[in-house]
């Protein structure tokens, strides 16, 4: 006899035990990835070698480490335990983030940024390709992932004013940017252990599920995996030469250049245009991030309601490009903040 499952109750359970802790991991990851953008507002005063060119290269070196270790890390997690691997990712990136406070040379700056990328590399594929499929069926996954995607903007809303405030703290004789790196490394280090106890990598291990719920999720996952094996398999070369894949890669590349360029340079650009203090810049940046969060939810709902995808993406990218393009030509601080708001809506 088949036992009826309360789907709403089951989803609420997974919201608390899976989506919420993974959401917090994503928030912490974003904070530690881009805190260098805020530290850059004051680092150059204490590190004479830190030119804009070196800062930009160091910000980008992160993605070199990310590139080399993303796929291997995801394969390891798929073979062993996704939750243990996510905890490892968090702990190691927290250590590297803390070490950033003690860098003294250009080489160390590049090294730590590379290591940060290498440590964090497989986080997204492990979450979306390894952990979530075991907990959420195909029809539920979009809802779970959409909730996760808001984590970047939530992190920016909380992280920008926090970073600005920390930059004006000189604890134990350290500079503000050193304080920022050390204190923002702590959440990753501490939450590692919370995450290990909070999240299980598969339903069978979850004490908060009933036996029927465990069996239901396990059976749904196995059926989905069985269907996947019947789909045509592509070689790596076939995937890399597929025209649709190449077009999507180009679109994603063009968007990601604007997205990360905006995130890494926005604090310094606003500070340069306005002359405001680091703390005021931090609080000001929370405004465009808040507007972008509202726009992201509204834009996603509009796309889901109408079923239209291409023009929603194209319009957002155009808005972002317009905001980025006009910002350098605006000298008034409040108007420049308005331009940044436009850019944030588009690129986010």
Model-derived segments and their meaning:
Residues 307-348:
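C-terminal transmembrane helical hairpin of 12-TM major facilitator-type secondary transporters
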Residues 69-81, 167, 295-308:
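Helix-to-loop junctions at the C-terminal end of transmembrane segments
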Residues 49, 81, 102-108, 119, ...:
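Helix-breaking motifs and short loop linkers at transmembrane-helix boundaries and internal kinks
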Residues 78-90, 304-317:
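Cytoplasmic membrane-interface "Motif A"-like loop-to-helix N-cap segments
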Residues 68-107:
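Conserved MFS/SLC helix-loop-helix module at the cytosolic interface between two early adjacent transmembrane helices
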Residues 112-150:
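Cytoplasmic helix-loop-helix junction between adjacent transmembrane helices
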Residues 36-37, 237-296, 300:
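Extracytoplasmic gate region of multi-pass secondary transporters
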Residues 142-167, 187-188:
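Glycine-rich segments within core transmembrane alpha-helices of 12-TM secondary carriers
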């Amino acid at each position: 006899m088949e036992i009826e499952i309360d789907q709403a109750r089951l989803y609420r359970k997974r919201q608390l035990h899976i989506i919420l802790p993974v959401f917090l991991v994503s928030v912490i990851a974003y904070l530690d990835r881009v805190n260098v953008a805020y530290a850059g507002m004051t680092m150059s005063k204490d590190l004479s070698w830190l030119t804009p060119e070196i800062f930009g290269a160091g910000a980008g070196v992160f993605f070199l480490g990310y590139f080399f270790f993303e796929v291997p890390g995801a394969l390891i997690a798929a073979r062993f335990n996704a939750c243990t691997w996510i905890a490892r990712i968090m702990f190691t990136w927290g250590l590297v983030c803390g070490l950033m406070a003690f860098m003294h040379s250009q080489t160390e700056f590049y090294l730590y940024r590379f290591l940060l990328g290498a440590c964090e590399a497989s986080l997204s594929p492990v979450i979306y390709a390894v952990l979530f499929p075991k907990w959420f069926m195909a029809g539920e996954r979009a809802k779970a992932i959409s909730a996760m995607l808001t984590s970047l903007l939530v992190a920016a809303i909380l992280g920008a004013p926090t970073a600005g405030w920390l930059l004006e703290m000189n604890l134990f004789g350290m500079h503000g940017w050193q304080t920022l790196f050390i204190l923002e490394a702590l959440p990753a280090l501490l939450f590692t252990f919370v995450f290990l106890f909070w999240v299980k990598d598969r339903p069978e291990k979850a004490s908060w599920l009933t036996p029927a719920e465990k069996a239901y999720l396990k059976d749904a996952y196995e059926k989905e995996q069985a269907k996947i094996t019947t789909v045509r398999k592509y070689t790596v070369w076939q995937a890399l030469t597929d025209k649709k894949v190449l077009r999507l890669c180009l679109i994603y590349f063009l968007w990601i250049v604007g997205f990360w360029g905006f995130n890494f340079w926005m604090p310094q650009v606003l500070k340069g245009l306005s002359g405001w203090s680091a703390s005021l810049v931090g609080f000001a940046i929370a405004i465009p991030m808040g507007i972008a969060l509202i726009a992201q939810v509204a834009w996603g709902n509009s796309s889901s309601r109408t079923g239209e995808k291409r023009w929603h993406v194209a319009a957002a990218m155009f808005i972002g490009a317009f905001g980025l393009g006009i910002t350098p030509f605006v000298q008034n601080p409040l108007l420049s903040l308005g331009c940044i708001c436009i850019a944030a809506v588009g690129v986010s």
